[in-house]
Amino acid sequence: MKPLTGTPMGEAVDSLPNRRSLAKLQTRQKVLAAARQMFAQQGYEGATIRDIATAAGMSTGAVFANFTDKSDLFCDIMNTDVESLVAAMEEAVAGETGVESALTTLFNAGYRFYQSQLPMARAAFSVAWTPDHGHVVRNLPSLRQLKAMITDQLEAGVARGELVSQAEIPLRTSMLFNIFLSNFPPAIFHGCAPEELEARARNQVRIVLAGALKA
């Protein structure tokens, strides 16, 4: 009897889940790319699941097989973007030894990161204050990371003796985070260049820290 040749049956069966997983991942990535394009072009409210499916060359069923709804899609994109933003900020601030300089550098890195993605930033602001999905966007894990970076810099300022021990760090973290966000609308709606945002942020950081600086 002639022995069988070729791929053993076990290996063939084992490879099937891998191929399925790869195909599912590729489909998911294709949907995300199409959704990013639609959100940037039409805004969050304007883009529909049908638009996204058409742009991806898929059925709406294929989109729903990967995401529960439009907000799920948008939050996935936003969380990925903010994770990349946090990484860019961490790289930018490495080596900074002064709290004011470090915070200004963090903010500047953020503005430059989004300079080429302002339509997505506009969509994010639109979703962030909707009653249905705003709380989800505002509480993304990556945004909590961003706030934690601000807290870390304030705590480092206290440890170095730049700031007083009673610096009300939670309050100042919240104020500085809101300041960081407040500079996006001038860029989105009025075309402010990164240099203008940086100058504005520098003054804002200085004012917020003024009451906590050691004499």
Residue ranges and their predicted role:
Residues 115-134, 185-189:
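Amphipathic alpha-helical segments used for helix-helix packing
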Residues 61:
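Key DNA-contact positions within bacterial/archaeal DNA-binding proteins
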Residues 1-42, 49-58, 72:
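Basic, helix-initiating cap at the start of DNA-binding domains
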Residues 112-116, 152, 156, 174-195, ...:
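Amphipathic C-terminal alpha-helical segment
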Residues 83-86, 116, 134-160, 170-174, ...:
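Amphipathic alpha-helical packing segments from all-alpha helical-bundle domains
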Residues 25-33, 45-46, 57, 65-90, ...:
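An amphipathic alpha-helix adjacent to DNA-recognition modules
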Residues 76, 90-119, 169, 173-176:
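Hydrophobic alpha-helical connector segments
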